[in-house]
Structures are given as C-alpha cells and as structure tokens.
Amino acid sequence: MSREDTYTRTSRSVVQCIAHTRTGARCKRRTRRTNLCYAHLEKEQHLKIKKSTIPGAGMGLFTTVQRRAHRMVAPYTGEYVTRPQDNYGGDYVVSLNGPPQAPPYKYVDARKTTDGAGRFSNNARRQDRKTNNSHLSANSNSRDAKVVASRNIPAGSEILTKYGNDYWRRHD
C-alpha cells in the first residue's frame, strides 16, 4: 500500500503519521503539521518544524543536515486548484508554471493540508542580517512544487524562502 493510499488530506486536524517503524508496522504517533510525526520528519527528510527565528512568523522549517545548492529541501504539497480564489489559501498558494495547454490544475494551495513541510518555510524579507537561502520551484507539467536550496545551507539553519514579487504585491 502506498503512502498516498494510507493518508487522507485534512484541514489542520490531527492525523496519524504515514511512516512505518523498523518492524514494518505503521507509526502510531499523531501529527497536525505534516503527514510525518516529528521523529519521522527528521529521520526521513532531515527537517524540523519549530519556532521561527523571524519575529512574529510563527513556526519555521529547519534543516538538520547541510543542504547543497540547487537541491530540493522539501516538497510543497497541497490541494491542486484551477484558480486562486479568495476561498483558497491566499498566503499558501503557489502558481505552477507552464504553458496554457498544461494540465488544468494551475496552483497548489497548502493552507488546508497537513502533508508537506514546505509550507512552514518563511521569507527573510525586511529582516536585518537574514537572507533567503531557498526559493520555490514549480512546474505544471509534472504537477509539483518544491522548496529548493539557492545556496549551501548549514545544518541547523532555518529554511528561508523567497516568496516572489506576486506575494509581496498583495502584502505591501
């Protein structure tokens, strides 16, 4: 059975971790932030979610291992939608690049999902002495979005992602 088969996307509710233990049994831990419990998120993706170093930003995404430039840090997953209406996630909507003939889903809305750690990456804009170390990469043909390291990121660092001009036009 695949992870997709054993996991149902929900709206910020508590879900069972989708990972399996060393014995092959499904992990019994519950989580409300991603589809993996804290232990499996660290073990499988080498990530932690904890209080951000950005004042007022809430939770942030941190790497537990060094990340090399131009490599994926975390998937950016959520509900695939055709247009970013007000009832969609707003701050958590990522546009999937692609030609007009690409699949009908043009956006990933991570507001209501608990299946991806990428949504916890913050932006360092307007923060003294902090710079973004990653960016969002999206593709409508492959229907995926991900957080990618823009430069080498040391272990223990917060993943700070460039959100792009469209995001800041809505927030300035």
Predicted regions and their residues:
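Fe(II)/2-oxoglutarate
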Residues: 1-9, 35-38, 45
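C-terminal SET catalytic tail plus cysteine-rich post-SET Zn-binding segment of SAM-dependent SET-domain
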Residues: 2-12, 125-172
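Cys/His-rich Zn2+-coordinating "finger/knuckle" modules used by eukaryotic regulatory proteins
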Residues: 15-43
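Intrinsically disordered, low-complexity regions enriched in proline, serine, glycine
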Residues: 26-29, 38-39, 49, 75-76, ...
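Catalytic cores of histone-lysine modification enzymes
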Residues: 44-130
